[in-house]
């Protein structure tokens, strides 16, 4: 993800002499204290989100419908209350973002259609190889597949499937709300957009370590394999979190990251090993390479802020005195 780094990694200066003390950058707090408040607020949100999954005592596995329903209740409550954490952070730091709280968190109408479509299209391009693999391995042809996808009965079955609702709706919506929409506005004034893109996913990645508890409880594998799997999942979710954080900043919308998260949950991690042993290996690997190449080529054009209107986080940094944030142009 080289496109996310570079000059975006510089720290936001908080001691420019031309800025008045009451600047919107850090309010009434010094830079060090403001950053500690921001990091502590993000850590509190992450702990609250993961902790809410374990308030219900149960001996049942995580995929049991009863467990899923209880956890729906928990994470929906935590996610609904998470904007209050941002509101409290704003009061403690004295930062004035220049927009409403909901707008700052990506809930706005300006540019909503390109924000919903273009990031999803970009992500599907990245998954060109896995999509080709899925198509090759599917026993039905394209016309039959579309009939199944568009059939109301198929959607009715999905909406009554607790695991589908968790993976495609509740998890993407609540995780993006908490780990992107709430955390990025708190981290950006402290460290700048570039470092925030890479710091925010660390909370997201660590939050997925709770799966170790489930696997150890039910002895789903050896201890070594469980921790190896957890380390891999942390790496994968951290990279994915950086990508959706990048999308959130560049579009100023929450809907794009949510849809991309849902799509990636459906696709899973690309089955590269299976592709290497596939009967149609050469065209499939060419599809993988083409997808990655087109993704890198289109990453900047399809996330150009000019397509999405005024970006709330960029407005916040402009008020903080940083009018040249690289990710804002």
Swiss-Prot record:
Disulfide bonds: none annotated. The modification N-acetylalanine is found at residue 2. Ubiquitinated. Undergoes 'Lys-48'- and 'Lys-63'-linked ubiquitination. 'Lys-48' ubiquitination induces its degradation. Deubiquitinated by USP17L2/USP17 that cleaves 'Lys-63'-linked ubiquitin chains. The record marks 261, 265 as: Transition state stabilizer. Ubiquitous. It holds the Pfam family Rce1-like. It is an enzyme of class 3 (hydrolase). It is a multi-pass membrane protein. InterPro entries: Rce1, Rce1/LyrA-like_dom. Protease involved in the processing of a variety of prenylated proteins containing the C-terminal CAAX motif, where C is a cysteine modified with an isoprenoid lipid, A is an aliphatic amino acid and X is any C-terminal amino acid. Proteolytically removes the C-terminal three residues of farnesylated and geranylated proteins, leaving the prenylated cysteine as the new C-terminus. Is able to process K-Ras, N-Ras, H-Ras, RAP1B and G-gamma-1. This is CAAX prenyl protease 2.
């Amino acid at each position: 993800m080289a496109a996310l780094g570079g000059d975006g990694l510089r720290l936001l200066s908080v001691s420019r002499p031309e800025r008045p003390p009451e600047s919107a950058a850090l309010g009434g707090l010094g830079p060090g204290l403001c950053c500690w408040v921001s990091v502590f607020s993000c850590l509190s949100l992450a702990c609250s989100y993961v902790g809410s999954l374990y308030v219900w005592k149960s001996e049942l596995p995580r995929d049991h419908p009863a467990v899923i329903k209880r956890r729906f209740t928990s994470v929906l409550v935590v996610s609904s209350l998470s904007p209050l954490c941002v509101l409290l952070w704003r009061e403690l730091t004295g930062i004035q973002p220049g927009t409403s709280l909901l707008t700052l968190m990506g809930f706005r109408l300006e540019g909503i259609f390109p924000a919903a479509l273009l990031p999803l299209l970009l992500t599907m391009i990245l998954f060109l190889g896995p999509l080709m693999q899925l198509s090759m391995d599917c026993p039905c042809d394209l016309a039959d597949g579309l009939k199944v996808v568009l059939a109301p009965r198929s959607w009715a079955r999905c909406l009554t499937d607790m695991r589908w609702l968790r993976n495609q709706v509740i998890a993407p919506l609540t995780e993006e709300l908490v780990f992107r929409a709430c955390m990025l506005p708190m981290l950006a004034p402290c460290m700048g957009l570039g470092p925030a893109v890479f710091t925010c996913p660390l909370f997201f990645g660590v939050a997925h370590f709770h799966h170790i508890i489930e696997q150890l409880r039910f002895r789903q594998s050896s201890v070594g394999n469980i921790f190896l799997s957890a380390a891999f999942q942390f790496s994968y979710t951290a990279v994915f979190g950086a990508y959706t954080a990048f999308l959130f900043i560049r579009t100023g919308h929450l809907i794009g990251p949510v849809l991309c998260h849902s799509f990636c949950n459906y696709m899973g991690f690309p089955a590269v090993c299976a592709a290497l042993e596939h009967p149609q290996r050469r065209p499939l690997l060419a599809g993988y390479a083409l997808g990655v190449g087109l993704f890198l080529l289109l990453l900047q054009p399809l996330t150009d802020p000019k397509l999405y209107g005024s970006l709330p986080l960029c407005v916040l940094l402009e008020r903080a005195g940083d009018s040249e944030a690289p990710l804002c142009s």
